[in-house]
Swiss-Prot record:
Binds 1 Mg(2+) ion per subunit. The magnesium is bound as Mg-PRPP. The lineage of its organism: Bacteria, Bacillati, Cyanobacteriota, Cyanophyceae, Nostocales. Belongs to the UPRTase family. This is Uracil phosphoribosyltransferase. Its EC number is 2.4.2.9. 5-phospho-alpha-D-ribose 1-diphosphate binds at residues 84, 109, 137-145, 208. Catalyzes the conversion of uracil and 5-phospho-alpha-D-ribose 1-diphosphate (PRPP) to UMP and diphosphate. Uracil binds at residues 202, 207-209. GO terms for biological process: UMP salvage; uracil salvage. InterPro entries: PRibTrfase_dom (IPR000836), PRTase-like (IPR029057), Upp_B (IPR034332), UPRTase/APRTase (IPR050054), Ura_phspho_trans (IPR005765). Allosterically activated by GTP. It comes from Nostoc sp. (strain PCC 7120 / SAG 25.82 / UTEX 2576).
Amino acid sequence: MTVQLRVYVPPHPLIKHWLAVARDAATPSVLFRSAITELGRWLTYEAAREWLPTEETTVQTPLEICPATVINPQVPVAVVPILRAGLGLLEGAQTVLPLASIYHLGLVRNEETLEASCYLNKLPEKFDPQTRVLITDPMLATGGSIMKAMSELTERGVDPSLVRIVSVVAAPPALQKLNAAYSGLIVYTATIDETVNDQGFIVPGLGDAGDRIFGT
């Protein structure tokens, strides 16, 4: 039986708070950047559940030896920010995954076709098949960028079931495309909005995340 895409909207008050700050058109760039960083932190924390590789061991407490669970250092963990807006979530994600390798992927969207093309690719030629990959992309709108990113990753040996996507706002077109192409994929997002307009922006959304992060 095919496992469908799973989308989680964590009911965490800090996620809700920082989403409200990010949505507000009056939020200045410096505060918007902080909001996206915090969303990256808390959404990555949620995404790491039952995803980070662990192993059983023992530790010596001041009193006696006891069983313990630790992160398995032998299994690679990678974060792939989709440039440029994905960089906004990266700092928060790194506070949760400080030892993860960072592989930048630069994608640009054709404003007429809404299709994505790659202008920067720092992915390795091949990933270890056990690699856990976290993709950061604030807006999952039409699905062009995230589908291109998934294509680049799976071509290099990444198992879609070991991928976690962290976004701030997701919309049905992107989620439907992911569901049709990749079984077992899991998305963590602060909210799901219903509409994408003719320009490919999520409505109500939060505007152009990249422009607001970088003040351009």
